[in-house]
UniProtKB/Swiss-Prot annotation:
Protein's name according to its UniProt entry: Biosynthetic peptidoglycan transglycosylase
Cystine bridges: none
EC number: 2.4.99.28
Family: Belongs to the glycosyltransferase 51 family.
Protein purpose: Peptidoglycan polymerase that catalyzes glycan chain elongation from lipid-linked precursors.
Source organism of this protein record: Escherichia coli O1:K1 / APEC
Pfam families (alphabetical): Transgly
Biochemical pathway: Cell wall biogenesis; peptidoglycan biosynthesis
Keywords: Cell inner membrane, Cell membrane, Cell shape, Cell wall biogenesis/degradation, Glycosyltransferase, Membrane, Peptidoglycan synthesis, Transferase, Transmembrane, Transmembrane helix
Superkingdom of the organism of origin: Bacteria
InterPro entries: Glyco_trans_51, Lysozyme-like_dom_sf, PBP_transglycosylase, Pep_trsgly
Entry keyword annotation includes DNA damage: no
GO MF, any single term: pentosyltransferase activity
Length: 242
């Protein structure tokens, strides 16, 4: 290998190492800060806003209103757990059984990829990372998930998740969603409304709360049944999530 190539390789290696250190400090600081402070915006919100500007859409505003857990209907927390991660109170960030099932499904159905991200993983991804699929991003997501599971309580993870989740075009967080779609604060959401909001979470830019498709309605009904089977509101109290 020539001296010039060695120099370039050495420069790139030093740059990447320094970048990793900077990102580790940034993300570690974010995990520590947001364990107590409200989250003003997420990486997904920034990505959506910048993308809108780059496409000439200057009317787009990524909107979110932070609310604490006692300002959110307990039905909402229960709905997203029923829909997205029923083992949320028990695991340490990863649902191994669901991951194995998703891998088996994806091997059989290459055109219909199924995910197995927990609420903790989705929180880490939405808060700190860019959109897309790659092994690098998955590795970073795993590390960040372990970080927030170590530092944050389950209640804090759920609170942050509900405040940064995307519920529609420019609608981030359950308070903004409740105001936009039901003209009420998040604290007043009914069981049915909470289930409808949770029903669009797989793809909130495709599935609409304001114009729910047959699929969304059937998913809403399924979520309502799961909420009942989990035990209703006492489930949240039992796991200290309310």
């Amino acid at each position: 290998m020539s001296k010039s190539r060695l120099t370039v390789f050495s420069f790139v290696r030093r740059f990447l190492l320094r970048l990793m250190v900077v990102l580790a400090i940034f993300w570690g600081g974010g995990i520590a800060l947001f364990s107590v402070a409200p989250v003003p915006f997420s990486a997904v919100m920034v990505e959506r806003q910048v993308s809108a500007w780059l496409h000439g859409n200057f009317r787009y505003v990524a909107h979110s209103d932070w609310v604490s857990m006692d300002q959110i209907s307990p039905w909402m927390g229960l709905a997203v757990i029923a829909a997205e991660d029923q083992k949320f109170p028990e695991h340490w960030g990863f649902d191994v059984a669901s991951i194995e099932q998703a891998l088996a499904h994806n091997e059989r159905n290459e055109n219909r990829i199924r995910g197995a991200s927990t609420i903790s993983q989705q929180t880490a991804k939405n808060l700190f990372l860019w959109d897309g699929r790659s092994w690098v991003r998955k590795g970073l997501e795993a590390g960040l998930t372990l970080g927030i599971e170590t530092v944050w309580s389950k209640k804090r993870i759920l609170t942050v998740y509900l405040n940064i989740a995307e519920f529609g075009d420019g609608v981030f967080g359950v308070e903004a969603a409740a105001q936009r779609y039901f003209h009420k604060p998040a604290s007043k959401l009914t069981r049915s409304e909470a289930a409808l909001l949770a029903a669009v979470l797989p793809n909130p830019l495709r599935f609409k709360v304001s114009a729910p498709s047959g699929y969304v309605r059937s998913r809403q009904a399924w979520i309502l049944r799961q909420m009942y089977q989990l035990g209703g509101e006492p489930f949240m109290q039992q796991h200290q999530l309310d």
